[in-house]
């Protein structure tokens, strides 16, 4: 049926990426997808964003494949190497420089996304450094979990090591990666921040998800962890940590936000933008995950303009 025909299309597209781009993903996600496919079409699906939480979205899958193709092309044009920073898998892209961008991916992301950003940053004299967050990329089975009290200290230690090498450090971060970055770097010298669909009020987001799930604070406090139908697990300890660890962000920051973002309300991002030195760009047709050709075109122009220090005109 259509589902299985499209699954074959997905796998054939992945195989084409491997063949035509000198096997750029052989040591990470694509090999995992192909291996799982031999066991179960459905199991293979879970590693592609279009299958998030078991929902089949053909257009999203194809958009993800196109995005990976663009990343492969960008990687081919940029000098890059794999390394480890504080024993965390990392990449460094670009020629040697005294200024750097630290790239922090979001949930379901991976350090290799930085190649796409690097095609704009490296020509401006930056090196781009990216790490895998816990449970992502080359750390899928890490003992560390994607929790703020684990991820933020890792980012902070990465910054501290980079500060010994670079005289200027900026940060580009996506979604929850932006929140982790603000927690980690709020007291550090950051020359510039670029945030893509940032989570800026985690407490509000968790409370919103509790409303979606019909869960009260009393229930969550009693049960500690409650799985939801939309794929997230509500966690009382997480919410309590968030409330005990507020952050203050006052760095020069450029934000791009989708008008249809279902993770951060418009009033929340606007309030955050007014509270600090932030330039906010809104793509009205954009979503939390920028992935359609139209959305990517806007994101590309925004990246290029802001890396160059220009004012982006939407």
Regions found by a protein language model. Give the residues of each.
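Gly/Ala-rich beta-loop-alpha elbow adjacent to hydrolase catalytic centers
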Residues: 173-181
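Catalytic nucleophile-loop/oxyanion-hole region of alpha/beta-hydrolase
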Residues: 136-163
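The serine-hydrolase catalytic nucleophile loop
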Residues: 107-119, 267
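Conserved alpha/beta-hydrolase
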Residues: 121-140
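The alpha/beta-hydrolase serine catalytic core
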Residues: 67-80, 188-271, 275-314
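The conserved beta1-alpha1 loop
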Residues: 102-106, 257
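An N-terminal hydrophobic leader/cap segment in hydrolases
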Residues: 39, 43-93
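Hydrophobic/aromatic-rich alpha-helical bundle segments in the mid-to-C-terminal region
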Residues: 2-37
